[in-house]
A protein has these predicted regions:
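Conserved MFS/SLC helix-loop-helix module at the cytosolic interface between two early adjacent transmembrane helices
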Residues: 66-102
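Helix-to-loop junctions at the C-terminal end of transmembrane segments
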Residues: 68-79, 259-273, 357
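Cytoplasmic helix-loop-helix junction between adjacent transmembrane helices
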Residues: 110-150
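Helix-loop-helix hairpin linking two adjacent transmembrane segments in secondary transporters
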Residues: 142-187
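C-terminal membrane-cytosol helix-exit motif in multi-pass small-molecule transporters
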Residues: 175-194, 377-384
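C-terminal transmembrane helical hairpin of 12-TM major facilitator-type secondary transporters
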Residues: 274-319
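Small/aliphatic-rich secondary-structure junction motif
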Residues: 411-462, 486-489, 543
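Glycine-rich, Arg-bearing micro-motifs that act as flexible, cationic patches
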Residues: 517-543, 557-560
């Protein structure tokens, strides 16, 4: 939440505990793509029909969906590390057993156990990385997103290479890699404190009573119906071996990762969540129609699948953003409820597609998938006003659009302060104190604006700190400044995902109160992350009719230019 100029601290200088979990994240995110290249080989070797093989997705995703309802209850009682380890143990056991199986029914059953482990793992991995990372919240999120992108992109490639040796290869590969991650997690990840309050088992289902969350959840269900129809059945009409299928889905995965991390936030910031989703879902419907029409033309299917990666990457990010926008409940509960509905759609789609393909022909499931994408537009339209209201801040619950909350005494009108914007970073005190000296020299009071960040990654949303912690941080700054004889006031600026939007809100606030100047520190996020979801400082520079300066401990403040 600070300036982009200069060199940011590297998010990759982390303790061994973080690398252990990040490695496991890469392998976990490989999960779906790893299996795709071996689907035709699996069907041939075990004399199974495509509809029978599709149950690998159904058992995995349906169990993951149901387990998402309970992961909050489990982790709030046994702690994040134990939940993480339990998930890893289950993945190792059931991935290994799937590799030893000689029947499609056995693999389907073992994939269900794998899905349970995956739910326990993905629900806690981000929290463990954030809790264990050095260099602050931003570095932890960058590392997690890197693991996400790497896993999605590399999974199909590894699956294709191992699958070209034997269809058992990807299963044994996951088991071995996750066992390494399990040992490293046990050895290096410290015990983390349990949450202060326990999550109710019924909380995610109760959350679905809220119209906004249920509406966005149904939209996600329909989207995942189309997505997993394509993922489960597109390999067959391509008529490629495991190695070449791996290359195709690697190209797809690279686009998913790139558009999810780098392009989706920028499109959202420019056009709004709902508008981008409308266009994106429509494009996915067209892609599915192309696959259905060209189901007997392998080249057409290959190109359509690779291109779909761009739209899927955007949708994966913005669908979660839409859920968080309209959700009036705590974000972990909203994530669990959303994950449940989302994965149910993904799990049922391959099963239904298989039955349709057996009864008709292979093009029909793809037509149905296209219809699901179009129906998702209709459902989104029914909740459009809720999304718009949330983006404007006119909803109850946790704030999603950037918003300022006063901490401490309200200043008198016309106080024209120097504003310092700073997040929950290691040298926050030094940045505030440097800005305080600048304010004192200018004969103006200081206003401390503390940035409270929430990151949204896939179906997960995690806060750098809760509201009380952010408030306590501001009060700590104010108390310290009081002892130094510097007049100061405080605010908390809540930011969810979109850093540039937070910068625009701060700029408008500075204009409204006729602030003398705005001081920022050096960004801990780096250039790539700032390109992805917008630079806070750049947004301030472009929107504030004020002087913007960078302050660094031990250095003279210097003015920034747009």
């Amino acid at each position: 939440m600070t300036a982009s100029h200069g060199t940011a601290p590297s998010p990759f200088k982390q303790p061994r505990a973080v690398w252990a979990v990040a490695f496991a994240c890469v392998v976990s995110f490989m999960g779906i793509g790893l299996v795709d290249p071996i689907l035709p080989a699996l069907a041939g070797s075990l004399h199974a029909t495509p509809s029978q093989v599709s149950l690998l997705f159904t058992s995995y995703l349906v169990v993951t969906a149901v387990a998402m309802l309970a992961v909050g209850w489990v982790s709030s009682r046994i702690g994040a590390k134990r939940t993480l380890i339990a998930g890893l143990v289950l993945i190792v056991i059931f991935a290994g057993l799937a590799g030893t199986s000689n029947s499609i029914g056995g693999i389907v059953g073992f994939r269900a156990g794998w899905g349970l482990g995956n739910a326990l793992f993905i629900a806690t991995s981000l929290a463990v990385i954030v809790a264990s990372a050095s260099g602050g919240f931003a570095g932890a999120i960058i590392l997690y997103e890197t693991a996400l992108g790497l896993g999605i992109a590399v999974g199909p490639l590894l699956g294709g290479e191992l699958g070209s040796i034997s269809w058992r290869g990807p299963f044994f590969g996951v088991a071995v890699l996750m066992f390494i991650a399990l040992v490293a997690t046990i050895a290096f990840v410290p015990n983390l404190p349990k949450p202060e309050h326990k999550t109710s088992l019924a909380a995610p289902l109760k959350a679905l009573r809220h119209r906004g969350l249920l509406t966005m959840g149904i939209m996600a269900l329909l989207y995942n119906w189309g997505f997993f129809t394509m993922l489960g059945y597109a390999p067959y009409p391509m008529e490629l071996n495991a190695h070449k299928l791996g290359l195709v889905f690697t190209g797809w995965g690279l686009l998913v990762a790139a558009f999810s991390v780098f392009f989706a936030p920028r499109l959202q910031a420019r056009f709004g969540t709902a508008k981008v989703l409308y266009v994106n879902l429509f494009c996915l419907g067209i892609v599915m129609a192309v696959i259905a029409i060209g189901v007997n033309t392998p080249a057409a299917v290959i190109v359509a699948v690779i291109v779909s990666g761009a739209f899927i990457g955007i949708n994966n990010t913005l669908t979660t953003q839409a859920v968080m926008l309209v959700s009036p409940v705590e974000r972990p509960v909203a994530s669990s409820a959303y994950g449940f509905v989302r994965f149910i759609g993904g799990g049922l789609a391959p099963f239904v597609a298989g039955k349709l393909a057996d009864a008709t022909n292979l093009s029909v499931p793809f037509y149905l998938g296209g219809v699901a994408f179009i129906l998702a537009i209709v459902v989104l339209a029914s909740g459009h006003k809720l999304v718009d209201a949330a983006e404007k801040g006119a909803v109850e619950g946790e704030p999603v659009c950037p918003s300022l909350q006063r901490v401490g005494a309200t200043p008198a009108p016309g106080y024209q302060p120097v504003i310092v914007a700073v997040g929950a970073i290691e040298n926050a005190d030094e940045i505030v104190d440097a800005a305080a000296l600048m304010a004192r020299d200018a004969g103006r009071p200081l206003e401390v604006v503390h940035i409270r960040e929430t990151a949204v990654v896939e179906e997960l949303a995690i806060d750098a700190e809760d509201a009380e912690q952010a408030r306590a941080t501001v009060l700590s700054h104010l108390d310290r400044l009081f002892t130094l004889g510097i007049a100061a006031t405080g605010q908390v600026l809540t930011s969810v995902g979109d850093h540039a939007a937070a910068g625009r809100v701060l700029a408008q606030h500075a204009n409204d109160i006729d602030a003398r100047a705005i001081a920022v520190g050096r960004s801990p996020r780096g250039q790539a992350a700032q390109f992805a979801d917008g630079s806070f400082t750049t947004a301030v520079l472009h929107n504030a009719a004020r002087t913007v300066v960078m302050v660094e401990p031990g250095k003279a403040p210097h003015r920034l230019s747009a």
